[in-house]
UniProtKB/Swiss-Prot annotation:
Pfam families: Fer4_11, Fer4_2
UniProt-annotated binding residues for [4Fe-4S] cluster 4: 79, 99, 102, 105
Cofactor note: Binds 4 [4Fe-4S] clusters.
Protein name: Probable anaerobic dimethyl sulfoxide reductase chain YnfG
Assembly with partners or alone: The complex consists of three subunits: YnfF, the reductase; YnfG, an electron transfer protein, and YnfH, a membrane anchor protein.
UniProt cofactor(s): [4Fe-4S] cluster
Species of origin: Escherichia coli (strain K12)
Binding positions for [4Fe-4S] cluster 1 per the UniProt entry: 14, 17, 20, 145
Function comment: Electron transfer subunit of the terminal reductase during anaerobic growth on various sulfoxide and N-oxide compounds.
Residues binding [4Fe-4S] cluster 2: 24, 126, 129, 141
Region called Disordered, residue ranges: 183-205
Swiss-Prot/TrEMBL keywords: 4Fe-4S, Electron transport, Iron, Iron-sulfur, Metal-binding, Repeat, Transport
Ranges annotated as biased composition (Polar residues): 186-195
InterPro entries named in the record: 4Fe4S_Fe-S-bd (IPR017896), 4Fe4S_Fe_S_CS (IPR017900), DMSO_DmsB (IPR014297), ET_IronSulfur_Cluster-Binding (IPR050954)
């Protein structure tokens, strides 16, 4: 493998505006049922009474997540046709001419990255905009973020710059697939496995 690329996600900056998601959909010409990049909204808290005085501990934060181009991708392991594969540059992609649309990859991926495109009759997913990267450009989601909450580059450089945190609630633990992401947590971020909050927009992710 030449260089493993990855994403840095700054949850302290992300406002959940979905510009990255819409830019991706426009660039990839995706229908309403498919979104390669999705915004997770995690929220929780309640009101508590203390001697007649009410206090709140309500919180919410956002995570912009696409395919994490994992070191140990679950999707490639279950693909019966070999359509889902990891390139030399680390991008996990699907060969749409080989894919049979069985959806095993979608069921295996803990992030739901591979998505079935009913119009095309096969699986589709984020490819890291590898054609843009080859031209020295940034992925369209990174380029479009108005808050500069996304960053892209060789994952080791991102880890040296931003640390190694790769999971907060509601994401799964990182050891399952070894995702190539780095997360800067929001001040309200909860650890993976947290039960004090909930995914506030499940139909969108």
């Amino acid at each position: 493998m030449t260089t493993q690329y990855g994403f840095f996600i700054d949850s302290s900056r992300c406002t959940g505006c979905k510009t990255c998601e819409l830019a991706c959909k426009d660039f990839k010409d995706l229908g309403p049922e498919v979104s390669f990049r999705r915004i997770y909204e995690y929220a929780g808290g309640d009101w508590q009474e203390d001697n007649g005085v009410w206090h709140q501990n309500v919180f919410a934060y956002y995570l912009s997540i696409s395919c994490n181009h994992c070191d140990d991708p679950a999707c490639t392991k279950v693909c019966p046709s070999g359509a889902m594969h990891k390139r030399e540059d680390g991008f996990v992609v699907v060969d749409e001419d080989v894919c049979i649309g069985c959806r095993y990859c979608h069921m295996a991926c803990p992030y739901g990255a591979p998505q079935y495109n009913a119009e095309k009759g096969h699986m589709t997913k984020c490819d890291g905009c590898y054609s843009r990267v080859a031209e020295g450009k940034q992925p369209i989601c990174v380029e479009s973020c108005p808050l500069r909450a996304l960053e892209f580059g060789p994952i080791e450089e991102l880890r040296q710059k931003h640390g190694t945190l790769a999971a907060v609630a509601p994401l799964p633990r990182a050891h399952f697939t070894k995702p190539n992401i780095v997360i800067k947590p929001n001040a309200n971020s909860r650890p993976t496995g947290d039960t004090t909050g909930y995914l506030a927009n499940p139909e969108e992710v």
